[in-house]
Amino acid sequence: MNKIGFNVLAWTAAVSDDLFPIIERLKGIGYDGVEFYLGPQEASAYQRMGNFTKDLGLETTTVMTVGKDDNPVSESAEVRQRALDKIKWAVDRAHDVNSKIICGPFHSGHTVFVNRPAEDREYALAGEVLNAAADYAAQANITFALEALNRFECYLCNTMEQLLKLVKAADHPNVRAMFDTHHSNIEEKKFSTALQTIAPVLAHVHISENDRGTPGDGQVLWDDAFSSLAAIKYQGWLTIEAFSRNDPAFANAIGVWREFSDPWDIAENGYRFIREMSLKHGL
């Protein structure tokens, strides 16, 4: 069975010792690992977290974003250099916490739009930054799992077809892709077609309901999602990503204006749901 993870953004975007009791409880539920947002905390906070999760017997994955001032598709070479520097910094923090995967939409600035569709030059610019960053990540055996977002958050990569184009532009074995059921539920015609498209470079999966609440409680076609993952013989992480207003600054940044589900309801029922669906579909 695939490893099951939980993204602690349901509680906070900050990596700190305050997460220790939450992570212990997630371990008790049965999770194989936890996922952290790579925010501006000191290296020592990540190192303590890395030691703590290792001692608990939990693996880790990480997620990051970039914005207007460190946008890999900016026309400004200075801004693109800041993007490269930030991704390298994230690699160091991921290494501190023992993560071998950095996922997320760090190919372009989150909610940065230019009032036109993406152009080939922008894929080339992002690919250049990601290729250089991946050379650095490879030294720590870290893989990038790039994420396509819905049209309201990103214009460079909304679909698996666009994401595959970006991965090819980066042209590096450590640059791969991820699949998020929330975004794909908005942008793709069918999960099966989307997953067949991205299968050759798929490295990570986020299990996320249409309303960002408890998986299985909403409108996502979960049988299609899990059967399609089984059809491509996916063997990576199945990590729940759900949000709340527990961290107001982060919630405001991603447009979370109300509570969807209690985080522990998400964690407990979501874990059971993933196991049931995985067994049902032979994943």
PLM region descriptions:
Residues 10-12, 38-40, 66-69, 106-110, ...:
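Active-site-proximal loop/turn and secondary-structure-junction residues that shape catalytic pockets
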Residues 32-33, 59, 100, 143, ...:
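Residue-level detector of anion-binding/catalytic polar loops
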Residues 20-40, 90, 96-100:
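Catalytic domains of carbohydrate-active enzymes, especially glycoside hydrolases
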Residues 55, 77-176, 261-265:
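Active-site acidic/histidine proton-transfer and metal-coordination neighborhood
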Residues 69-74, 110-116, 153, 186, ...:
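A short acidic, helix-capping loop that chelates divalent metal ions and anchors anionic groups
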Residues 1-27, 98-100, 157-179, 184-283:
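Histidine-acidic metal/acid-base catalytic patches
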Residues 60-62, 103, 146, 179, ...:
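Hydrophobic residues in well-ordered beta-strands that form the structural core
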Residues 42-52:
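Active-site-adjacent beta->alpha loops and helix N-cap segments on the catalytic face
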